Design a protein with these regions (language model features):
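A contiguous, well-ordered beta/alpha segment that forms the leading edge of an enzyme domain
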Residues: 1-130
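Cysteine-centered nucleophilic/redox motifs
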Residues: 132-144
């Protein structure tokens, strides 16, 4: 994090610590690889209803909006495709067209519905990865 402007070292230190704290908090909510995050818990859950935080509901709604705006390019249910390519695992690979088609079919068939302010329902084999969206959201939250 780089800070620019006419601010004291004390102010910049406070701003940096606040930003770091917010990034850490959001990582604990949205990191699909951390067993302590809500996203990880959803990805490991069987189909059915799941209780989640109000903040995650808001984030999911925003991610769905961006999925629609981008005609599916920012798909929050892309986790299995990320796994297929080995992204984040240290062993990346190029999957076959057949493998990609199979995973894409699973993504299209799975559903995540928001029930209320603290519940979602999943059907099918869902694997969320908010990746790019989460990074942008985190920067927005720190900026605010």
């Amino acid at each position: 994090v780089k800070l620019y402007g006419d601010i004291s070292d004390e102010q910049s230190g406070r701003i940096f610590e606040t930003a770091k704290s917010e990034f850490t908090r959001l990582d604990s909510l949205l990191n699909r690889y951390s067993s302590k995050s809500e996203i990880y818990r959803i990805n490991e859950s069987p189909p059915g209803s799941i209780r989640v935080s109000r903040e995650l509901i808001d984030i999911l709604k925003r991610s769905f909006r961006w999925r629609d705006i981008t005609d599916g390019l920012l798909e929050p249910k892309i986790g299995h495709l990320v796994e297929l390519w080995g992204i984040g695992s240290g062993t990346r690979k190029i999957p076959s067209h057949t493998e990609v088609d199979s995973v894409m079919k699973s993504i299209r068939e799975s559903r995540l519905n928001i029930i209320d302010d603290t519940s979602i329902a999943i059907t099918g084999d869902i694997s969320l990865d908010l990746g790019a969206f989460a990074k942008g959201y985190a920067v927005d939250m720190v900026y605010n």
